[in-house]
Amino acid sequence: MLSMNETKRNVRPAGFEDAEDIFSLIKAYPEELLPRPISDIVQNIDRFLVCAQAGRLVGTVSWKILPEIGAPRNPSIEIQSLAVDRAYHEKGVGRELVGAVIARIRATHPAQIIALTFCKPFFERLGFHEVPKEELMHKIYAGCINCSKYDSPFTCPEIAMILDIAG
């Protein structure tokens, strides 16, 4: 029988049939991820990718377009809700998901890709670098204002990281 490392993985766009599994993956990380109601997942299913292995979903990632006021040709895109089943950590699932979402995003020519994360080394290995949150506040404000975990984006311990891809 094949092990988790030997079983073929499939990263693909999410479908409506994946919504409940996506919800469960995100819900498994209450300290690390903002909750996403299942209705939000369904409404944004076209902005989710999933990783399936051994007949089940083992990871998910989504993205959000952050338009720049007065510069519609230079939006940033935020990677959100990256969640990998704990049994599949350190097996390349997160790297595959982020790589797939970057490839998809790159085709739209955004100015940069943003991630707010507790996993700085993971994103550094993918080419991201840390920036002060103040540099991104106008872009992430809409998400941060609805956060139920922290009083202010400046008290949130997440690290702001960007991948510059314009050029």
Q: What is each residue range found by the language model?
A:
Residues T117-G143:
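Conserved active-site alpha-helix within GNAT-family acetyltransferase domains
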Residues V84, E90-A103, A115:
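Conserved acetyl-CoA-binding loop-helix of GNAT-fold acetyltransferases
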Residues L25-R36:
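Helix-loop element at the rim of GNAT/NAT acetyltransferase active sites that forms part
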Residues A14, L82-V84:
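Hydrophobic adenine-recognition pocket in adenosine-nucleotide-binding enzymes
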Residues L136-G167:
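C-terminal "cap" of GNAT-fold acetyltransferases
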Residues R36-R47, Q53, T60-S76, Q80-L82:
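A conserved beta-strand-loop-helix scaffold within acyl/acetyltransferase catalytic domains
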Residues I105-F118:
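Conserved GNAT acetyl-CoA-binding A-motif
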Residues K8-I22:
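A short beta-loop-alpha structural element at the N-terminal edge
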